[in-house]
């Protein structure tokens, strides 16, 4: 698949972009290069290849899931302009 300069110009128009001639030519070349790479990837033979979940066959050592911060909601709410019953009160934006 490749795009013509006319098609790139139409895409730029729809995206509300204005491209000069140099930008149009560069963007056309860049997008066509990307499409060429995508076509190469699509043509790779992958039959018989197992999907992998992770590129390494090693496992990461995980740390224990322990709470390391203290409850500070009372401190945070003490500096808030308005609170009620543990909730922050903010001005109405949409009615």
UniProtKB/Swiss-Prot annotation:
Enzyme type, top EC level: ligase
Q: Answer yes or no on keyword Nucleotide-binding.
A: yes
Q: Which reaction does it catalyse?
A: L-glutamyl-tRNA(Gln) + L-glutamine + ATP + H2O = L-glutaminyl-tRNA(Gln) + L-glutamate + ADP + phosphate + H(+); L-aspartyl-tRNA(Asn) + L-glutamine + ATP + H2O = L-asparaginyl-tRNA(Asn) + L-glutamate + ADP + phosphate + 2 H(+)
Q: Which family does it belong to?
A: Belongs to the GatC family.
What this chain does, per the entry, is described as: Allows the formation of correctly charged Asn-tRNA(Asn) or Gln-tRNA(Gln) through the transamidation of misacylated Asp-tRNA(Asn) or Glu-tRNA(Gln) in organisms which lack either or both of asparaginyl-tRNA or glutaminyl-tRNA synthetases. The reaction takes place in the presence of glutamine and ATP through an activated phospho-Asp-tRNA(Asn) or phospho-Glu-tRNA(Gln).
Q: Which Gene3D superfamilies match?
A: Glu-tRNAGln amidotransferase C subunit, N-terminal domain
Q: Which GO terms describe its molecular function?
A: asparaginyl-tRNA synthase (glutamine-hydrolyzing) activity; ATP binding; glutaminyl-tRNA synthase (glutamine-hydrolyzing) activity
Q: Which UniProt keywords apply?
A: ATP-binding, Ligase, Nucleotide-binding, Protein biosynthesis
The entry's protein name is: Aspartyl/glutamyl-tRNA(Asn/Gln) amidotransferase subunit C
According to its UniProt entry, one GO biological process term is: translation
Look up the EC number in the record and give it. Answer: 6.3.5.-
Its gene name is: gatC
């Amino acid at each position: 698949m490749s795009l013509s300069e006319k098609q790139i110009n139409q895409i730029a128009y729809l995206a509300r972009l204005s491209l000069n001639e140099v930008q149009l030519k560069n963007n056309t070349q860049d997008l066509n290069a990307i499409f060429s790479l995508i076509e190469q990837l699509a043509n790779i033979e992958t039959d018989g290849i197992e999907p992998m979940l992770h590129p390494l066959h090693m496992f990461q050592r995980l740390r224990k899931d322990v709470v390391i911060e203290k409850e500070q909601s009372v401190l945070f709410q003490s500096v808030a302009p308005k609170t009620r019953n543990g909730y922050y009160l903010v001005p109405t934006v949409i009615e």
